[in-house]
Amino acid sequence: MDRVRGSAFLLGVLLAGSLFAFSVAKEETKKLGTVIGIDLGTTYSCVGVYKNGHVEIIANDQGNRITPSWVAFTDSERLIGEAAKNQAAVNPERTIFDVKRLIGRKFQDKEVQRDMKLVPYKIINKDGKPYIQVKIKDGENKVFSPEEISAMILGKMKDTAEAYLGKKINDAVVTVPAYFNDAQRQATKDAGVIAGLNVARIINEPTAAAIAYGLDKKGGEKNILVFDLGGGTFDVSILTIDNGVFEVLATNGDTHLGGEDFDQRIMEYFIKLIKKKYSKDISKDNRALGKLRREAERAKRALSNQHQVRVEIESLFDGTDFSEPLTRARFEELNNDLFRKTMGPVKKAMEDAGLEKSQIHEIVLVGGSTRIPKVQQLLKDYFNGKEPNKGVNPDEAVAFGAAVQGSILSGEGGDETKDILLLDVAPLTLGIETVGGVMTKLIPRNTVIPTKKSQVFTTYQDQQTTVSIQVFEGERSMTKDCRLLGKFDLNGIPSAPRGTPQIEVTFEVDANGILNVKAEDKGTGKSEKITITNEKGRLSQEEIDRMVREAEEFAEEDKKVKERIDARNQLETYVYNMKNTVGDKDKLADKLEAEEKEKVEEALKEALEWLDDNQSAEKEDYEEKLKEVEAVCNPIVSAVYQRSGGAPGGDADGGVDDDHDEL
């Protein structure tokens, strides 16, 4: 606040602000349809829905229950998921991944600066935010915000759910790391809007995983520690579970630590090895790095079950095949400091929760990186030999919990979920700047949300008519060491001696962990309020609207590509079926007159040549060509069937079955 003396609080005590818990079973029931649960991960995403009394984790169009969080652009189309990841080595600069590490961040953040050097695609500075520049079709350069790329992945999860459920889905619960700050949460919500989703609730990943663990657990109170180490982020949450009540006691973490960092260490090891052994530096060769990244991830996964793997890559550089062993011991040595780094947040969370190690009843492992034996061992050692619980699927637990929360919000959960109550917490302390740059805390970290707290401040100077409210998050005592979330002015305060006006500042954190701040002059009733988000990083409503339009255009473009491929397949199928029909003695070969056969074969030959010459024709061209071929072939086939007294179920179209997509 503009020159407000920290000690000049007129109401020294907070209006203790109702620290209220919330039951979400009845909330928003009327306006929500089926609410899906989406785990939007750094490396993989997953979607679930609560149906027929249990959660279904939904497989994508490739039959996989987790989908790579990858997006790629080629000269003709946009690819999402496996299709994007599988072509990354041949199209590195146009293949985007790890976008969760950029969302809600500033371009100058040290993590962003570090990541820029590690990814093959181009990250640029736009209005202080990291944006991704990529060539889309026809060589056109396009700039995307991290929210837009995340929206493409959310859109893929939405499509996956819609295909399974056979209906349109508008509402979702989306998960975020517990340690995500305000800007990152708001940016994730914006991504949902761009994807055409109403994000009914943002919930923390470890809390969602705790639901997956505790949904069917009855009996007394249990303290559980959720250790969530994923592809790009790390969270620790400590909860008490008691007959359906999930209360978060403390949370901690690192939003930039995960499996991708372990892969990077393997890559750096092999880059050095190649330089030493072959005198070749591949650190700037995006194609080689793409191949190496894929194999590093594969090797890391294999080392969870084996003690040694061989990393083999055909033609890694200059036509040279690469083959080198990697042992589990070497992998652990390369990542030793990162593995040990996970123990810091565990200790802090335990301190904040005020629990002894012996008071933790269960340790729940979430995230693919918890399969690493060394990580499990460190955790086991910290808890004096206690074995972690492996009862939840580490890849699916978060989406599972999100789907349960979705069913509570929609009212579709029924008796199974009606007693569930989530009491989550704000991960970081929230406060304002008072005189001398002091961080005056209004909402301490690990406060149960939603919550509302007010405090009265006054002016620092005589005749002061404006105060500036600067809102920060962080644990340090001075605002210069905390993160500025936003600021706004309250104008029109009547002139008065210093210390006279009473300005009430109210902080309200909603169930999504997003902060609203209001300042009111008690004398005049004049007030200002804002939803605090990373003021420079937040997308404006105009930008969100534009991105929604562009997302719809991309979806339309994707639809056109599919229709074009379907039309081509239809033509090809007809031609090959007809070719088979006129060439098969059991079908029409012996029944056609020479002139008829020649006419049909000529039409089919011409159609196949046309297909070869027109690989990227439009849908209408394929349809027109099909009509041309049918106009020649169908009358001849009909005439033959009539001459032979009709055929059982005689098709006049060469037996084409239009109802099935070809594989």
Curated annotation (Swiss-Prot):
Q: Which residue stretches does the UniProt record annotate as biased composition, category Acidic residues? A: 654-663
Any one GO biological process: ERAD pathway
Q: Where is this region: Disordered?
A: 641-663
Assigned keywords, A-Z: ATP-binding, Endoplasmic reticulum, Glycoprotein, Nucleotide-binding, Signal
Where does it mainly reside?
A: endoplasmic reticulum
- Lineage, top-rank taxon, reads Eukaryota
Q: Which subcellular locations apply to this protein?
A: Endoplasmic reticulum lumen
Short motif Prevents secretion from ER, span: 660-663
| A Pfam family | HSP70
Glycan attachment sites: N614
Q: What does this protein do?
A: Probably plays a role in facilitating the assembly of multimeric protein complexes inside the ER.
Question: What protein family is recorded?
Answer: Belongs to the heat shock protein 70 family.
Q: What is the designated name of this protein?
A: Luminal-binding protein 3
Which species is this record about? Zea mays
Q: What is the lineage of its organism?
A: Eukaryota, Viridiplantae, Streptophyta, Embryophyta, Tracheophyta
